[in-house]
From Swiss-Prot:
The active site is at 975 (for picornain 3c-like protease activity), 1011 (for picornain 3c-like protease activity), 1100 (for picornain 3c-like protease activity). This is RNA1 polyprotein. Disulfide bonds: none annotated. The modification O-(5'-phospho-RNA)-serine is found at residue 909. Residues 458-626 form the SF3 helicase domain. GO terms for molecular function: ATP binding; cysteine-type endopeptidase activity; RNA binding; RNA helicase activity; RNA-directed RNA polymerase activity. It comes from Broad bean wilt virus 1 (strain Spinach/United States/ATCC PV-132/1963). It comes from the Viruses. Pfam families: Peptidase_C3, RdRP_1, RNA_helicase. One of its GO terms (biological process) is proteolysis. Signal peptide: none annotated. InterPro entries: DNA/RNA_pol_sf (IPR043502), Helic/Pol/Pept_Calicivir-typ (IPR004004), Helicase_SF3_ssDNA/RNA_vir (IPR000605), Helicase_SF3_ssRNA_vir (IPR014759), PCV_3C_PRO (IPR044067), Peptidase_C3A/C3B_picornavir (IPR000199), Peptidase_S1_PA (IPR009003), Peptidase_S1_PA_chymotrypsin (IPR043504). The record marks 318-319, 908-909, 934-935, 1143-1144 as: Cleavage.
Length: 1842
């Protein structure tokens, strides 16, 4: 049965129980009989059924309630009783069955007479007892339903129908009885569970008192209505709370609509009392008012609990008065006097109630106005109470007065000349005027008392405002902000100035009179009164005595500036306006302006705007700015254009933001200035100056009196009765006012200037605070409390003797102005002057209020009381709402006790016995729970456990405590975790990380006999390895009783933050089973811990810590409580807790910090690495600065990055302590998110579908190790592993001097390499196997990237980037898995957005341009901040799933793919000796970094697009129709169709990404605010522009600023500086040619002409460069091969094959040379020197020489390498070579394809160790020169060999 039908059934019963005719009938037939009660109930049920029959017959309600039908139904009842009941032997049984059937059909519950009159025991079972079964509960509830209807009726009728009392106590007792009646059968149970229930009246009184205080006690004398209204509303909520608690605890089987029964019964008796006893014509109004009360209760119930009074469950809502007022406003809008039947009809929307209801105030005023109208109908006259309340509460008058008092106190404590005080006064005056206008516009009678109050306060504010106008300070001020409009005549500059000023005043909440229009021709500032805005129209058009330009020099400055005033009384006016707006036809200063330095004038204009008209738009008088265009210009010549705004709104936003930024800078500037020291002499001079000023506007009679009677005295100040004259020696003469013989005009002048003079003296004293601090620090108390009397002595009001002495020690002139100030703003009460006015108003109105209130009927009182309860009871209702969320468990009892208990007990705990450092947790002070009266000890060990274990799981709006477990898992209470829906996005918050992941129920593991569940996921952060040692798993080994500590970390909704709490426990091992109950959930556990401590809601998951064997350990998690005794479940054991940690068989040794250094949720420093496991991180740059003449006078915008802390380039700067490691790791501080799962899934599915469509003909399976190592020959994008890079960790620890990276683990020649090291092979296998079940541990080395960076990123804001070196074994495992996929992504860049592998010199660049231009030429170019640091695990998982889907992986293969990829997102990072734990981001050394970054880039943009058009499926699902996109890592270009560009644009992307924690800026101008559409020619991609050539092709031109740094710094680590420089020059030639061949030719000529050492043939010719680009454009040569041939022409293969010798030869006895491919001997027969080929040797059997090739050197190394490592005496190679010679072995030199390198090496080594005379080396090398012409450099470079 639906809720409306149930409501109607209740209505039938209510009417039936209220019929006197039925009562009389039953009394007549069964009076005094045992069946009387049953018969009465049966009669009511029978009559209600008859009413239902009439209703079902579709009779109108008027017809159902007509006298005809009432008589008809009574006849049926009487007939039924006479025929079927009176003489029936089984009458009672039949009546019970009838009643039971009705209850079952109407309310789904039973009725039983046997339990009707019985007294029921408590439902709380005794020990050994059992809970009643549901059948018993249903029987009792069925009875209680009827008892409720009777008891409520009787209780309220007894209290109200007699009308003997209308007291608050009587009404609240009535409510208490009604609540008891609603639960009469269960009262013992409720009273046993809730101790506060018996004190409910006091609770309701306390709440009503608190609400009355919030209303500023305005209802004194008539507060009864508030007490009754709040009592009724709150009682309805309490009934609903108790009912839900009984249902969830299975005491009753389901909700029975108790709030409805309670409320309708209460309203029924009130209705019957008043509607039947009053005149008929007023019954309609009474019914409306009672309907208003009912609606108020139901509205509060629905807002708090998501539940109507009828009992229907709805979504839980957040309590707030605004939504409830809307409901009430909707109700009263339908009130009409035509008929009662209009009540309850469907009401219109809120917009139909009253136009302009846009705020809480408007709705409150509207409801009050309707109540006033209804009250006038009931009372016959307009209600003064409601009229006054509508203004006091609706207009927030009390709060406004309170603000005025706060401002007044601020004015007395700080300088009144401060601009912020002046503006605040203006704001309060404007607010007061608005309130006064609201009073005058009220439709009902204007409340004269309130109007008088507001007017009085306004007069005082205006007096204060006028008094501080002349208080402008002669001190440093904020520089005003100047806005300058320029443009031709007639473009509407004046209009935009006026609109800009009006908008600024509105935004700053200032009145329209705060604008001063400056007349440039007036030498005086006539009319200037420190207005906030100054405007200049036609600035500089007409020269005056002082030009406008010259005037601005002093006005727009931070120096004090006194303006010229015509009136003597206004002399000393200082300028401190905040905004200057000028309009002029001239952009520059007038040459005749007298400004000698035009730049000084120009830089004072903060924003310069040129106004012009749009050609295609006509002028609209209604919107004069609509046809204007605004161009933002530089303020200085040549006035370059900065931006263009097409609308006024855009301009206004820019100007206001610029203004606020300017004000903030000025505020910081003023706060940095020192406070000047002032002397007494200066103070006296200032006081004389004040006297001169006050004398200037004092009446002549006062001045003349001083001259005649007080020689040497100065007029100082006056009060209402006295005039004070001051002598320079300090004396003050007091003259009564009547002696002055002043006329009325003079007295008015004295009165008007009195306050102004007093404030000037007060400000002067504040400027000299060190002379007499008392007058400054205690001025507020002295003035407000009137502690100085008219005779300038301490008054009787000052009772403190010490303070009296201090006041009397003040100079008399100070006492004089303090006394005068008291006369203006003193208050006799502790409250301020303004609130005291409110008290006077209340006092004057109280008697009339009480007189009127006596005539109010009860419905009107209840209506007003319930409405005020909603306005003022928000805190109470929020508390009740918090109880609703926990009413399903035992913690409800404790929570209810804390809310319903009045007052608080004093804790009797010992003071803490540890210092404060131990009582902070995550930078928050720990709140102590003093349960046992002991001081808890929270030591370092417990803090470590809490820090690493305690976490919070956030599921939508719910939060629960969980405990991090070893590995990637957490423990939590099962009754919460099991309820989390599958597939929702949740967040795990620890002290260091925030991780979003999708909940998978399959990963939740339950343990037998435990309430704790374990959730394991590879997405979770990894807990410390040592955590498992801090868990105690064996409950049996614990003592029976032991002390413990209870630790929680819960979110406090009031404080809006997490609060740590700690308490002492005395734990016991339980001897009986525990049944954990949560809603329908039941779970019995036999093993648990108990402690008699009253835990509260949200404690589940709290940590129970105890000292075990001298060490603090976690013994359990809190899982349940019955309000008095808590229970904890022991920590369950899981085999995965002891999974071996570390990378393969290596376990890093480090000292773990007790408190890690947290950089953010995604990264923390966890400890210091042991010395034996520490590796060096470099620190020396490979860049060499070239000689100055080599730099060719080209600018250098980039220099080498900072590699180590303490770089000399930063010495003496603010960045001297810059640490590149510490700062670089901050990029991993926080992952992006959260991502909505459905949208993310849809986006990833669409990308995977695109892959499938493009995958035809591609293999995706894994490759073997050989292919992963060597690549596949002649297969594009299948390159070999780069062996010159680092081998990673831990292999780096084993590297010996002279050994190189990965190469030392590889043997063979390129293309045929193999790994023979067993450790590497075993580690590769380990990664492949362990990743099938879990995420492997990964140790990575962080190195600072040695690169050239912009100067600002090196000197001003150092931002060195980190490069991450991953283990070689892991990289190979990844290559085996993904190499085919990488090739697919790079190969299909023609259809995929990812452009990795693009050749910018080929036609591929043009294809990118054409793809983008297909959607139009509106392109977004984005740049991300810390892109490789924010990759979240949830997206890495999605990428892994997408790969698995396209490959077709299942089961273990899918898990392996996911875990391998997640390993790089969750790793250990080694930064020198500091070890970091990183939980997001992607390391730069990951083999798939650029691919994954590209996919992430694509996902982010498509996800943003999907969310942008989430509700528009026709656009949302067709990304490629409206958008074209290319990505390369974090670079992207997004071409957007014009059809959607208004919505999907740069502003949307910036804001959307910001919500995900991602900062996006313009990719071209990274300092620009926002992202705007660009044309393709203006876009950057891979630092290249798009240039369209004459033939229609496109070139990727690189900006020249990226080229010139190559002339300043070269990388010469592997080659000589000159060789590297030549290579850089050739690279510059290639790039310059793309932009202009002429520039390339000019650059080549310049290099040759200025650098004589550069041989022309070593530079590429222009024709060679042109040929190179032609070949690239036509795709004839791969890019790398073409570059290699161009730059190393002498290394090209011989024209005739076989020209170089390749066979093994014995060139001397025992000396052999050979080539790799043609050697057929046995290496065991030789001592081998292997040239460039990786080969491992046994000790004493040879060595290898690995070197970089020199440019054009015939396969030999550079000259520097030969000199240092071959020819130099005592070098390592010579030593190893001599050892081989001394053993008498045959010596074999072997090189790769030819014997020539081996031959030359052999000769040079023999000569260097003196085994070969110079003559023979000459002959041998000359022979080699004859065979290989490329060795022609040898005689020149090595003359000692010839």
């Amino acid at each position: 049965m639906d809720s409306e039908t149930i409501d109607m059934c209740v209505k039938f019963l209510k009417i039936s129980f209220g019929l006197q005719s039925l009562k009389n009938l039953v009394k007549e037939l069964f009076g005094g009989s045992e069946l009387e009660k049953l018969a009465y109930v049966h009669a009511a049920f029978f009559h209600a059924n008859e009413m239902a029959i009439h209703w079902n017959a579709d009779l109108p309600w008027e017809e159902v309630m007509s006298s005809k039908r009432i008589k008809e139904r009574f006849g049926y009842v009487k007939s039924h009783f006479l025929r079927n009941v009176v003489y029936n032997a089984d009458a009672s049984g039949q009546m019970i069955r009838y009643n039971t059937t009705t209850c079952e059909q109407w309310f789904c519950c039973n009725f039983n007479l046997a339990s009707y009159s019985a007294s029921y025991n408590s439902l709380v079972p005794e020990e050994g007892g059992s809970m009643p079964i549901n059948e018993e509960a249903e029987i009792k509830i069925g009875q209680s339903l009827l008892t409720c209807a009777q008891s409520v009726t009787k209780a309220i009728y007894a209290k109200l129908s007699t009308l003997t009392t209308r007291s608050i106590q009587g009404f609240l007792e009535c409510l208490r009885d009604a609540i008891c009646g609603a639960f009469s059968s269960w009262l013992p149970c409720i009273r046993g569970a809730f101790a506060w229930f018996g004190n409910i009246i006091e609770v309701l009184k306390h709440w009503a008192g608190a609400a009355h205080e919030k209303l500023h006690n305005f209802l004194e004398g008539i507060e009864e209505c508030l007490y009754m209204g709040l009592g009724l509303v709150a009682s309805t909520c309490i009934v609903a709370l108790i009912e839900k608690f009984l249902v969830t605890m299975s005491v009753i089987s389901g909700p029975c609509g108790r709030p409805t029964l309670f409320l309708t019964s209460a309203m029924a008796i009130i209705s019957s009392t008043y509607l039947l006893s009053k005149a008929v014509e007023k019954s309609s109004a009474f019914t409306m008012l009672l309907g208003f009360v009912t609606q108020s209760c139901q509205t509060v119930l629905g807002s708090l609990f998501g539940k109507s009074a009828k009992g229907s469950e709805e979504a839980q809502g957040q309590f707030g008065p605004s939504a409830m007022l809307e409901s009430l406003a909707t109700l009263v809008s339908s009130w009409s006097s035509s008929s009662v039947t209009e009540i309850g009809r469907t009401f219109g929307a809120i917009s139909q109630i009253k136009n302009g209801i846009i705020a809480l105030k408007d709705m409150a005023l509207f409801v009050f106005s309707k109540l006033c109208e209804m009250a006038s109908k009931v009372l016959g006259f307009e209600s003064q109470i409601l009229a006054d309340l509508s203004i006091i509460l609706g207009e927030n008058v009390a709060d406004w007065l309170d603000e005025c008092d706060c401002m007044l106190a601020y004015l007395l404590e700080f300088n009144s000349n401060a601009r912020d005080i002046f503006d605040r006064l203006s704001q309060l005056i404007e607010k007061g005027k608005a309130i006064r206008m609201g009073i005058l516009r009220t439709t009902h009678r204007g409340p004269s008392q309130v109007l008088s109050l507001v007017t009085k306060a306004l007069d005082k504010l205006t007096e204060l405002h006028n008094s501080v106008i002349m208080s402008g300070a002669n001190s440093t001020r904020k520089t005003p902000f100047m806005l300058f409009f320029t443009g031709k005549s007639g473009v509407g500059k004046t209009s935009v100035v006026q609109r800009m000023a009006a908008n600024w005043l509105q935004q700053e909440q200032l009145g329209s009179n705060e604008v001063y229009s400056r007349n440039g021709l007036d030498p005086f500032w006539s009319g200037y009164k420190r207005q906030a805005v100054v405007t200049y129209d036609d600035f500089g058009a007409v020269p005056g005595s002082v030009s406008n330009e010259a005037e601005i020099i002093n006005v727009v400055s931070s120096n004090p500036h006194s303006v010229m005033m015509a009136d003597l009384k206004e002399k000393g006016m200082y300028f401190d306006s905040r905004l200057i707006i000028a309009s002029s036809n001239f952009l520059a200063a007038n040459p005749e302006s007298g400004v000698h330095d035009s730049e000084a004038y120009e830089r004072r204009r903060h924003v310069v705007v040129q106004v012009s008209l749009k050609e295609d738009m006509a002028y609209d008088p209604g919107n004069p700015c609509a046809n204007q265009r605004y161009t933002l210009l530089e303020s200085k010549a040549p006035f370059a254009e900065k931006a263009v705004f097409e609308s006024y709104e855009e301009l206004w936003s820019h100007v206001y933001n610029a203004f606020k930024a300017h004000e903030e800078k000025e505020k910081l500037f003023l706060s940095s200035l020192p406070i000047p020291e002032r002397s007494e002499k200066e103070a006296l001079q200032a006081l004389i100056g004040i006297c001169v000023m006050t004398t200037s506007y004092a009446p002549k009679a006062v001045i003349q009196y001083g001259i005649d009677h007080l020689v040497g005295y100065h007029y100082l100040i006056s009060s209402a009765e006295h005039v004070y004259f001051w002598h320079e020696k300090g004396e003050v003469e007091i003259v009564p006012m009547h002696l002055m013989k002043l006329d009325k005009m003079d007295k008015a002048t004295m009165a008007s200037t009195s306050l102004k003079s007093a404030l000037m003296c007060q400000d002067m004293a504040k400027n000299f605070p060190t002379l007499n601090p008392l007058a400054v620090l205690y001025a507020k108390n002295i003035v407000i409390r009137g502690w100085v009397d008219a005779n300038l002595q301490a008054s009787k009001k000052c009772e403190d003797s010490y303070m009296r002495e201090q006041i009397e020690s003040l100079p008399k002139w100070q006492r004089a102005y303090l006394h005068v100030l008291s006369g203006h703003i003193a208050s006799n009460e502790t409250r301020g002057w303004f609130l005291n006015c409110l008290e006077v108003t209340k006092s004057n109105s109280r008697s009339s209020y009480i007189w009127e209130y006596k005539s109010w009927p009860m419905p009107l009182k209840l209506a007003l009381g319930s409405f005020l309860a909603i306005l003022a009871g928000s805190a109470i209702f929020c508390s009740l709402q918090s109880l609703w969320s926990i009413s399903g468990n035992a913690s409800f009892v404790a929570g209810a006790a804390s809310i319903f208990t009045i007052g608080s007990a004093t804790a009797q705990s010992a003071p803490p016995n540890k210092d404060g450092s131990e009582y902070t947790y995550r930078n928050k002070k720990i709140k102590i729970r003093n349960w046992e009266g002991q001081g808890p000890c929270f030591g370092d060990s417990a803090l470590w456990i809490a820090e690493n274990c305690m976490a919070t799981l956030v599921v939508m709006k719910d939060r629960v405590q969980v405990c991090m477990a070893p590995g990637r898992s957490f423990l939590g209470v099962n009754h919460f975790l099991r309820m989390i829906p599958n597939g929702v996005m949740v967040k795990l918050e620890t002290g260091m990380t925030e991780t979003y992941f999708v909940w998978e129920k399959s990963k939740l593991k339950l343990f037998e006999n435990s309430e704790i569940a374990l959730y394991t996921s590879s997405n979770l952060p990894k807990a410390p390895d040592s955590l498992v040692d801090r868990f105690h798993f064996d409950l049996e080994t614990l003592p029976k009783t032991f002390p413990a500590q209870f630790f929680t970390y819960k979110f406090d909704k009031d404080m809006q933050q997490y609060v740590p709490e700690l308490g002492e426990l005395l734990c016991k091992k339980a001897e009986r089973a525990l049944c954990v109950v949560s809603g329908e959930y039941r779970r019995v556990i036999s093993h648990h811990l108990t402690y008699r401590n009253p835990t509260v809601a949200g404690d589940c998951g709290g940590l129970v810590l105890a000292i075990i064997e001298g060490k603090c350990k976690l013994v359990g998690l809190h899982v349940a409580s019955d309000g008095e005794e808590g229970a904890a479940s022991p920590v369950p054991w899981d085999p995965d807790f002891k999974v071996a940690q570390g990378q393969s068989d290596f376990l890093l040794s480090y000292d773990e910090w007790a408190v890690p250094k947290v950089l953010g949720p995604g990264c923390k420093a966890v400890g210091i690495i042991s010395p034996e496991h520490t590796v060096g991180s470099g620190g020396k740059t490979s860049f060499l600065e070239t000689p100055i003449e080599w730099q060719l006078n080209r600018p250098c915008g980039k220099i080498p990055s900072i590699l180590v802390k303490g770089d000399v380039r930063l010495a003496g700067t603010e960045n001297a302590d810059y640490d590149p490691f510490a700062v670089g790791m901050t990029k991993y501080a926080k992952e992006a998110g959260p991502f909505e799962p459905n949208g993310l899934d849809r986006v990833c599915e669409s990308i995977a579908e695109t892959w499938h469509d493009a995958s035809d003909g591609f293999e995706f399976g894994p490759v073997d190790l050989e292919a992963a190592l060597n690549g596949i020959e002649n297969m594009e994008y299948f390159d070999a592993l780069v062996l010159s890079t680092s081998e990673g960790y831990p292999y780096r620890l084993d590297r010996k001097p002279g050994e190189k990276g990965k190469a030392r683990y590889v043997e063979g020649e390129p293309g045929n390499l193999e790994i023979t090291d067993e450790r590497i092979l075993a580690d590769i296998h380990w990664f492949e196997e362990i990743s099938k079940t879990q995420v492997p541990d990964l140790y990575c080395i962080e190195c600072v990237k040695d690169e050239r960076l912009p100067v600002r990123k090196v000197i001003k804001e150092p931002k060195s980037r980190l490069f991450t070196v991953l283990p070689m074994s892991y990289n190979l495992a990844i290559r085996k898995k993904f190499l085919n996929f990488v090739r697919f992504i790079m190969k299909r860049r023609d259809v995929l957005p990812c452009q990795v592998g693009i050749n910018p010199y080929s036609r591929q660049w043009g294809k990118v341009a054409d793809r983008l231009l297909e959607k139009g030429n509106s392109i977004l170019c984005c740049d991300y901040s810390r892109f490789d640091g924010f990759l979240p695990k949830c997206i890495m998982v999605k990428i892994a799933e997408m790969f698995s889907n396209i490959v077709g992986e299942t089961g273990a293969e899918r898990e392996q793919t996911k875990n391998l990829m997640l390993a790089c997102c969750s790793r250990y990072a080694i930064c020198g000796r500091v070890l970091y734990r990183v939980e997001n981001g992607i390391p730069s050394g990951f083999p798939l970094t650029v691919i994954v970054n590209s996919i992430l880039n694509e996902i982010l943009i498509k996800y943003a697009y999907w969310k942008c058009f989430e509700t528009e499926s026709l656009i949302r699902d067709h990304f490629d129709t409206y958008v074209a996109m290319v990505v390369y890592g974090d670079d992207n270009l997004i071409s957007v169709s014009e059809a959607i560009s208004s919505k999907f644009n740069g502003n949307f992307l910036v804001n959307f990404m910001c919500n995900l924690g991602i900062k996006v800026t313009d990719g071209v101008d990274k300092t620009k605010v926002g992202i705007e559409f660009r044309t393709i020619e203006d876009c950057d991609f891979l630092k290249r522009k798009f240039k369209e050539n004459a033939d229609g092709t496109w070139s990727g031109v690189m900006a020249e600023e990226h080229l010139w740094p190559q002339l300043h710094f070269v990388k010469a680590k592997k080659v000589e500086m000159s060789e590297a420089y030549i290579s850089n020059c050739n690279n510059i030639l290639r790039e310059l040619w793309l932009g202009s061949p002429e520039k390339a030719a000019a650059f080549r000529r310049e290099v040759i002409s200025k650098l004589k050492w550069v041989e022309p043939q070593r530079l590429l010719t222009i024709s060679q460069v042109a040929l190179f680009h032609n070949e690239q454009m036509n795709g004839e040569h791969p890019f790398v091969e073409a570059c290699h041939q161009l730059e190393n022409l002498e290394l090209m293969a011989p024209l005739e094959p076989g020209m170089l010798p390749i066979k093994t030869q014995e060139i001397m006895p025992g000396l052999f040379v050979a080539s790799e491919k043609n050697f057929t001997g046995n290496f065991d027969d030789y001592f081998t020197i292997s040239i460039t080929t990786n080969r491992k040797f046994e000790d004493g059997k040879g060595f290898q020489i690995i070197f970089p090739y020199g440019a054009g050197r015939g396969g030999l190394p550079s000259k520097a390498f030969m000199e240092q490592n071959v020819i130099r005496k005592g070098c390592a190679i010579q030593k190893a070579f001599k050892q081989g010679l001394e053993k008498g072995n045959k010596m074999l030199f072997i090189s790769q394809s030819s014997v020539i390198p081996a031959y030359v090496f052999a000769i040079m080594l023999y000569r260097s160790v003196d085994r070969l005379p110079r003559a023979l080396s000459n002959k041998a090398l000359t022979s080699a020169l004859g065979i290989c012409k490329k060795l022609s450099y040898l005689p020149k470079d090595f003359p000692d060999l010839f």
